[in-house]
Curated annotation (Swiss-Prot):
Residues 28-96 form the BTB domain. Belongs to the NPH3 family. InterPro entries: BTB/POZ_dom, NPH3/RPT2-like, NPH3_dom, SKP1/BTB/POZ_sf. Residues 477-502, 524-559 are annotated as: Disordered. This is BTB/POZ domain-containing protein At5g47800. It comes from Arabidopsis thaliana (Mouse-ear cress). The keyword Phosphoprotein applies. May act as a substrate-specific adapter of an E3 ubiquitin-protein ligase complex (CUL3-RBX1-BTB) which mediates the ubiquitination and subsequent proteasomal degradation of target proteins. The modification Phosphotyrosine is found at Y417.
Length: 559
């Protein structure tokens, strides 16, 4: 930081009650009142250097004590005292922290060269241009200090000059950056660096007021020099700096009762940041967008802001990670941990866009679209596995999200099966009908042999799902060409998987002996409501007699 020292005499001001008095043998003849502070001074020192005081004291006798109120002086009593000390040649230290107040106050008092040669105002202006604007952090600190005197600083051009200086340095090639800057990314300090990172400037400007930050970013973008990703990184750093719960996945962050003033500040920040996000896809990460959507709901951001965030999030949903989706629910009416409604809304927007693109593109371009939706389907199934572990997760929300994924998106149902199994394990109290609803979207034909074998033995699964798994297990185990051909014919014509016991018996071509046993299994399961029917230590063997071959399936039921 740059400093300027003016004056040679020691500070002899002292405070007595609400007055500031100078230690001197000369009686005071000038009283300056600024709000609740009174200064007892001398006309002979201040009037020659202050054009305003000279004009106010012109018609007064020299022997009279003059009292003047300067309640409107910019910077208040502190700024006036700096100017007064200069008039007494008392040492004052100026830096980016107090320069703006001193500049505005000296301008108010008309302490120019035309009033007295070598006056304070030209000295301050020279320091501002030759030192402050040449420094990186000095320019930022000075710009931030203009928030206390916005009109004065605008009229004096301080704001514009500081912004121009900051933007010029942001656009400087990293190989030429030699000034001190703040960069505290995790692990950065431990690595050896041969060059300055491209986003070296983002942390320092995050100290700025929101409006000033917006002005700097807007000015930088107007040069069309910075890539969108750098703008996005600056927005991310700023949001993390001013939203205390943005970086945390803790669910306690949303439970803190904030006052309306804090909510309004955060609401304004979210609205402003969203409007500044570059239109270029990938300018900000999907995780950043999803967390903004969550916070936008919490702070009650405008509908326009939330709609735009959901649209942007859906464009990049395939880039999301599971951690990105695990956003806390901040609704006081819900007990479950995760905001599944938010994920469902973004997924719905993604699917609308995907269907629109699929119908518009030629078949040659559909490979990428298919890859995209399958990647999203895997992500959603992983998300379902995570939220299934929440004991308060309603069946309806789980089912709604699992069924939102189109059939074409899931090449395999192994992940979905795992999610359903976790849900059944964590929620053993759910009814038979709810179990059926959970498994409604599960296609046993798309289960791997290993997972299907697990499903056959899974006591938690509804009987219908177990029988379907048995059916497809037989189909996959059949070695005869005719059996494979028949199975292929059955499902390539769009027919549904047999779900009732009679059609299942028919499709499996059960012989008389095995039919009775299988039917007993079905009836027993229905009567007992999915209760355990076999001992794990004494597994029963059910022999399914197909056409020309026998297949033995051991069903082990744990009590």
């Amino acid at each position: 930081m740059k400093f300027m020292k003016i004056g040679t005499k020691p500070d002899t001001f002292y405070t007595q009650e609400a007055s500031r008095i100078l230690i001197t043998d000369t009686p005071n003849d000038l009283v300056i009142r600024i709000n609740n502070t009174t200064y007892h001074l001398h006309r002979s020192c201040l009037v020659p250097k202050c054009g305003l005081l000279r004009r106010l004291c012109t018609d007064l006798e020299e022997s009279d004590t003059v009292t003047i109120e300067l309640n409107d002086i910019p910077g208040g009593a502190d700024a006036f005292e700096l100017c007064a000390k200069f008039c007494y040649d008392i040492t004052i230290n100026l830096s980016a922290h107090n320069l703006v107040n001193a500049l505005c106050a000296s301008k108010f008092l008309r302490m120019s060269d035309s009033v007295d040669k070598g006056n304070l105002l030209p000295k301050l202006e020279a320091f501002f241009h030759s030192c402050i604007l040449q420094g990186w952090k000095d320019s930022i600190v000075t710009l931030q200090s203009t928030t206390k005197l916005p009109e004065w600083c605008e009229n004096l051009g301080i704001v514009r000059k500081c912004i121009d200086s900051i933007v010029e340095k942001i656009l400087t090639p990293t190989s030429e950056v030699s000034w001190s800057h703040t960069y505290t990314r995790p692990g950065y300090a431990k690595r050896q660096h041969h060059s300055v990172p491209r986003d070296w400037w983002t942390e320092d400007i995050s100290d700025l007021d929101l409006d000033l930050f917006r002005c700097v970013i807007t000015a930088a973008r107007s040069t069309f020099t910075l890539p969108p990703q750098l703008i996005g990184e600056a927005l991310h750093v700023y949001t993390c700096r001013w939203l205390p719960y943005f970086k945390s996945n803790s669910h306690s962050g949303f439970s803190v009762k904030e006052n309306e003033a804090a909510l309004e500040r955060h609401r304004r920040l979210v609205n402003t940041v969203v409007n500044m996000i570059p239109a270029d896809k990938g300018s900000v990460s999907e995780g950043f967008l999803l967390r903004l959507v969550s916070i936008a709901s919490y702070v009650r951001a405008s509908l326009t802001t939330k709609t735009e965030l959901i649209r942007k999030s859906s464009l990049q949903l395939e880039e999301a990670t599971l951690e990105d989706l695990l956003l806390p629910s901040h609704s006081s009416s819900h007990l479950h941990r995760y905001d599944t409604d938010l994920v469902a809304t973004v997924l719905e927007s993604f699917l609308m866009l995907w269907r629109r693109q699929s119908s518009a593109h030629l078949s040659s371009n559909n490979t990428q679209l298919l890859h995209s939706i399958r990647k999203v389907a895997k992500l959603i199934d992983s998300y379902l596995q995570a939220v299934a572990q929440d004991v308060h997760m309603p069946v309806s929300k789980f089912v709604s999200l699992s069924e939102a994924v189109p059939d074409i998106a899931r090449q395999s149902h192994d992940r979905l099966y795992k999610a359903i199994n976790i849900f059944l394990k964590v929620h053993p109290e759910i009814s038979k009908e709810e179990k059926k609803r959970l498994c409604r979207s599960l296609d046993c034909q798309k289960l791997s042999a290993q997972v299907r074998a697990h499903a056959v033995k899974n006591e938690r699964m509804p009987l219908r799902t177990v029988v379907q798994a048995l059916f497809f297990d037989q189909e996959s185990g059949s070695k005869g060409a005719s059996s494979r051909s028949e199975s292929q014919e059955l499902f390539t014509r769009g027919k549904e998987t047999p779900t009732d016991e009679h059609s299942m018996m028919h499709k499996l071509h059960l012989g008389p002996a095995s039919t009775g046993k299988a039917k007993n299994v079905l009836e027993e399961g229905c009567k007992r409501g999915e209760e355990k029917t076999r001992s794990s230590t004494d597994p029963k063997k059910i022999v399914w007699k197909g056409t020309g071959s026998e297949h033995k399936h051991h069903i082990s039921r744990d009590r």
